[in-house]
Amino acid sequence: MACIYPTTFYTSLPTKSLNMGISLTTILILSVAVLLSTAAPPSCRECYQSLHYRGEMQQYFTYHTHIERSCYGNLIEECVESGKSYYKVKNLGVCGSRNGAICPRGKQWLCFTKIGQWGVNTQVLEDIKREQIIAKAKASKPTTPPENRPRHFHSFIQKL
């Protein structure tokens, strides 16, 4: 990404452009706006749905864990919502099906998680992560030798 510094910016403008009525402030503001717009991650605003709840209209972000490949084309965009990355695609099966695949009905745009799309169930991943945490906790637990306890109460009485 190119950086534009005001000192370089002012000296690099030809004097002819100053006479055409374009102010340096306008050019600087437009340049900064272009730089900021390219740096910001795209939002997932197309994946919000309106819902009436208790007499109020509310917006909810909806995403899917898996969408059939034939429901969307080759144009896959990344978007960010609440710090998490999603894929955003145009729904080619708005009526509910396309090429035999069942597609989400009535939505023009679809967002889906990256990991669920490629055939990995998110519940399986959560279980694997949980097992890893438990295994790590067991490994870090200090091992103490077992105490000499009798296995049965009657063997304890016999020793006395």
UniProtKB/Swiss-Prot annotation:
One GO BP on record is: syncytium formation
Chief localisation class: secreted
Asked if the keyword Transport belongs to this entry, the reply reads: no
Query: Domain of life of the organism in this record?
Result: Eukaryota
Disordered: region residues: 137-160
* Residues annotated as signal peptide: 1-39
Q: What GO cellular component entries does it have?
A: extracellular space
State where the protein is found: Secreted
Q: Which UniProt keyword terms apply here? A: ERV, Secreted, Signal, Transposable element
Tissue and organ distribution? Specifically expressed in placenta by extravillous trophoblasts and syncytiotrophoblasts (at protein level).
Q: How does it assemble?
A: Interacts (secreted) with SLC1A5; mainly at cell surface.
Q: What else is known?
A: The human genome contains a high percentage of proviral-like elements, also called endogenous retroviruses (ERVs) that are the genomic traces of ancient infections of the germline by exogenous retroviruses. Although most of these elements are defective, some have conserved a functional envelope (env) gene, most probably diverted by the host for its benefit.
Protein role: May play a role in trophoblasts syncytialization, the spontaneous fusion of their plasma membranes, an essential process in placental development. May negatively regulate cell-cell fusion by interacting with SLC1A5, the probable receptor on the cell surface of the fusogenic syncytin-1/ERVW-1.
Q: What is this protein called?
A: Suppressyn
Q: Which organism is it from?
A: Homo sapiens (Human)
Q: Which gene encodes it?
A: ERVH48-1
